[in-house]
Amino acid sequence: MSVTKGNRRDSSVEFDNNYFKIHDDAVRLIRNKFGASKDIREEAVNYIRVVSSKILSDILDIGKYIRIANSIYPKNKTELEERRVHQDKAIGLCYDLLTKYQLIMRTLGTKDDKYTVEAGNIVHENNCLKAWRSSDNKRFKDLG
């Protein structure tokens, strides 16, 4: 089925838009040292610095894998599998990102509700990526 020219519009890729929210949240948290009190130990400051670097690296990798997967329009089973691998890597990094936030909360002794919005955005991103992968399974079932 084709869409008439007057009814065409840009596709809003929700997982792509949400990715930028996750990035902005992380930058804000890092700038604020994850809400740690001013009198935290030097070891905790160093830990925050190390984990912050890994968090930003993971977020940039999520974006990279989303871009790579989205740039592959599968014409055969191999291309479909390659696209799926990149989707899976992005999904895995979302879980890893949540784990890093949990580790920081435990290290700093912050309350569970401190990063609710940020964690919610990551979970939403993960669900969007899974829905995208599921949609691909339906769209390209004749290739697999």
Predicted regions and their residues:
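Amphipathic alpha-helical assembly/interaction segments
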Residues: 1-144
